[in-house]
Amino acid sequence: MSFTVAIVGRPNVGKSTLFNRLVGKKLALVDDTPGVTRDRRPGEAKLIDLRFRIVDTAGLEEADEETLEGRMRAQTELAIDEADLTLFVVDAKMGLTHVDKTLAEMLRKRGRPVVLVANKSEARGSDSGFYDAYTLGLGDPCPISAEHGQGMMDLRDAIVEAIGHDQAFPPRDDEAETNVSIPRSAVGEDGEEIDEEPAYDETRPLRVAIVGRPNAGKSTLINRFLGEDRLLTGPEAGITRDSISVDWTWRGRTVKMFDTAGMRRKARVTEKLEKLSVADTLRAIRFAETVVIIFDATIPFEKQDLQIVDLVIREGRAAVIAFNKWDMIEDRQAVLADLREKTDRLLPQARGIRAVPIAGQTGDGLDRLMQAIVDTDKVWNKRIATAKLNRWLETQQVQHPPPAVSGRRIKLKYMTQVKARPPAFMISCTRSDSLPESYVRYLINGLRADFAMPGVPIRIHFRTSENPYETKKKR
């Protein structure tokens, strides 16, 4: 991306709608409630022939530094300072307010490039607000409708004029963009038999979502990883509303980490905005590969904690538990032993899941947590040679034969791995519909133990093998 643009303005002027328009996706939550956006949300924008990095920000308000609104304002001001250009959005339909004028004065004092955007200019009665925008002293306002996509060519021209043609259209390095080696494993050749077990790619970027109940310490943990106050934190529950992604590097490996809104029990989620936030969290889980579920070590294993883990496993993601606020625990050795016993007992569907005690406030245990994420990702990507699987299947049947149905024993004939991420296997057998669930669990637990696959979802699909003599009998 050649340059960075920050979208700023007071609450509810249409900043997130414009952000979604420019990135071409509904990444930012949009609602009539003021103050929906709280953290900085980055994205890759496309506007006609322009390509640039865009940052959505919280609505700017006059507030004390100690308040939530004051902390949101500090994040927005940081986005302005880091950007090459600011899109200052005002509501042409409603007209200017005292806050608009205060923000315009702040932007003028900074002396950075600014494009004044008069949004909602398609609305009846917007002319007065549009002409009032000239009084802000930030040049000609650019009339647009972010919701309907009107005025985008004018906005493109205003950006090029403000940023300069050379920065807007830097020379392209075609070789850097096209000469990319894509490993075969990235293409996805699921369903093929595996003769050799491919090595784990230590350089592949990791996608990690951080989830949990409200106020479990998710944003604090990510800030500690980054070494900066990138995300809003505080004692107020439910600060995070959007799923925000941040990029950083751990031991030379790129990590894209998603902060998410706290997930409460479904019965308690009644407001439309909170429902949108939870839906956004679910999208983050599905986009991620490894999901870290934050438990509050002082009150662990709430019903909602267990339901979140179950959701992650059902979605097929690799899961890791982080027992946060470990610095508040006194008899740590005894408590850790108790927590691990309860983890295995209460989460049989994720037997062996890695659980790491951490302290997000102090940073204790973060290296151990990252190592657990990498180790779990290795298992989630694991592929096992077909020959090994069939030898294993034969041994399992000797040790514990499948049950008999109507006096005839079910035979498991052949096994192969059909995909990874998560590991999934196909077994060809007789009477697959009669195989009891208890025997399926026996096979899954055996795979976990014998092939070192703790804590990740394992899928087994059964296919009834055809009897070649069946058609002859019917003739």
Swiss-Prot record:
Domain EngA-type G: 3-167, 206-381
Pfam families for the chain: KH_dom-like, MMR_HSR1
Stretch list, region Disordered: 168-199
Keyword GTP-binding: yes
GO biological process, one term: ribosome biogenesis
InterPro entries noted in UniProt: G_ENGA, GTP-bd, GTPase_Der, KH_dom-like, KH_dom-like_a/b, P-loop_NTPase, Small_GTP-bd
HAMAP family reported in the protein's UniProt record: GTPase_Der
Summary of subunit composition and partner proteins: Associates with the 50S ribosomal subunit.
Function: GTPase that plays an essential role in the late steps of ribosome biogenesis.
The protein's name in its UniProt record: GTPase Der
Gene name in the database record: der
